[in-house]
């Protein structure tokens, strides 16, 4: 009985200890976790209060770049692809047959009209000239003798010693001799001309190309192979095409130029449209439209004194047909495309942005004409547009200067000093530098 009683008491003690341990663990978990949660909540609350009080002060304004809409005189240009052609092109060939004795030009050389280019062996033509001159001397002597005989016959005819028939025959001999002398003179002139043709000269001023025949070859007149080709490049022409819808504007520009005794300006630009090569004027317009392409050909002339234009070169021709007065102009970067059409972001005195729908006109890679929706003097955003919403306030910054770009270390120092001296983050940052990202510590 006693042993059983002891076992029962030990069991109760063991159960009591286990229950006490369980109660202690549950109590610790309950009360300890609640305290931690309260502490964490308090910290988060405090952090939230700090954020609520200081977050607005630390949030940076969106940096943008801006420009002011201005009134300008804007020229209207029509652009078409063109080809440079020589004002005149001459294929130099020989007019006489013979051996090519000499070439008196350098390939690619600029020559003037009348300059000696080549020589054909002149000896055969010198011989022909000598023969013609000898024949002339012979026939001239015959003519002189016939004229003296005619004078004697005329005297004898008066005395009746010769018949009238003999007198007429002598007169015919004189006329025949006169004809022979004239023929001989023609032969001499022909021989002299052939001798002149043996010296080949430049018919026009221009640039000679590559020689097509070498010295020593026998050349015949009328051969298909030329000696050289000369292209006149001072001046030079550009033939370009424009759509037929542009014809009225071109005709009107010509009429306006005629009234003021002026010219219609034309510019030649390179194939990338980045560099202007030369300035000239409209020379002529073709008299019919190409029905295949719906375009019309135009020809412009350029002095080309600096030889920037070369025959068969492709260029972009820009013809000025009008000049808009008091046009409102903004940078091209300011105009955006939306579902409602073109628009710009404008800035008020407080640097708050507002969206304005606009109608655009003439534009190029740098500026665009605003036909409606904007007035001169209004400021528009040109950079940082992707961060804008209606009515938001922004910070207008200026582009980074060349000195800042050249010295990155000084730029970073200046930016750091500016950030430390202003309540708005990022105010000392260069205009085209990216906005500083918020770290995890700042977020918490």
Swiss-Prot record:
Signal peptide: 1-20
Gene Ontology MF terms in the entry: efflux transmembrane transporter activity
Region (Disordered): 37-60, 398-444
Entry keywords, A to Z: Cell inner membrane, Cell membrane, Membrane, Repeat, Signal, Transport
Self-association and partners: Part of a tripartite efflux system composed of MdtA, MdtB and MdtC.
HAMAP family the record matches: MdtA
Name of protein: Multidrug resistance protein MdtA
Species, as recorded: Yersinia pestis (strain Pestoides F)
Gene: mdtA
């Amino acid at each position: 009985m006693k042993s059983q009683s002891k076992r029962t008491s030990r069991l109760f003690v063991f159960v009591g200890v286990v229950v006490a341990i369980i109660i202690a663990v549950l109590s610790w978990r309950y009360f300890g976790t609640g305290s931690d949660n309260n502490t964490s909540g308090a910290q988060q609350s405090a952090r939230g209060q700090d954020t609520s009080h200081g977050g607005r002060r630390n949030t940076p304004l969106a940096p943008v770049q801006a420009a002011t809409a201005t009134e300008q005189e804007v020229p209207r240009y029509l652009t078409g692809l063109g080809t440079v052609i020589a004002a005149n092109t001459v294929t130099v060939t020989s007019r006489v047959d013979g051996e090519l004795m000499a070439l008196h030009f350098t390939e690619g050389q600029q020559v003037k009209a009348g300059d000696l280019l080549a020589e054909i062996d002149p000896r055969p033509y010198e011989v022909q000239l000598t023969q013609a001159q000898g024949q002339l001397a012979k026939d001239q002597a015959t003519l002189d003798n016939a004229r003296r005989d005619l004078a004697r016959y005329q005297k004898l005819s008066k005395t009746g010693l010769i018949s009238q028939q003999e007198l007429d025959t002598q007169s015919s001999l004189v006329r025949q001799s006169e004809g022979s002398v004239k023929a001989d003179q023609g032969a001499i002139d022909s021989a002299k001309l052939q001798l002149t043709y043996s010296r080949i000269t430049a018919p026009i001023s221009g640039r000679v190309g590559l020689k097509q025949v070498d010295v020593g070859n026998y050349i015949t007149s009328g051969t298909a192979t030329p000696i050289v080709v000369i292209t006149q490049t001072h001046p030079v022409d550009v033939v370009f095409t424009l759509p037929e819808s542009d014809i009225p504007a071109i005709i009107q520009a010509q009429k306006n130029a005629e009234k003021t005794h002026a010219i219609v300006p034309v510019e030649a630009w390179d194939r990338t449209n980045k560099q202007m090569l030369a300035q000239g004027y409209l020379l002529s317009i073709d008299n019919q439209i190409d029905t295949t392409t719906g375009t019309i050909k135009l020809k412009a002339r350029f002095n080309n004194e600096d030889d920037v234009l070369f025959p068969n070169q492709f260029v972009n021709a820009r013809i000025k047909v009008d000049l808009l007065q008091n046009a409102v102009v903004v940078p091209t970067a300011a105009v955006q495309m939306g579902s409602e059409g073109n628009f710009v972001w404008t800035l008020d005195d407080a640097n708050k942005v507002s969206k304005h729908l606009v109608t655009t006109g003439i534009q190029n890679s740098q500026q665009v004409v605003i036909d409606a929706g904007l007035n001169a003097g209004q400021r528009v955003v040109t950079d940082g547009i992707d961060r804008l919403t209606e009515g938001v306030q922004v910070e207008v910054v200026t582009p980074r200067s060349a000195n800042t770009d050249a010295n990155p270390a000084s730029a970073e120092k200046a930016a750091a000093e500016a950030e430390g001296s202003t309540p708005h983050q990022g105010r000392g940052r260069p205009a085209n530098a990216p906005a500083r990202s918020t770290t995890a510590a700042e977020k918490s």
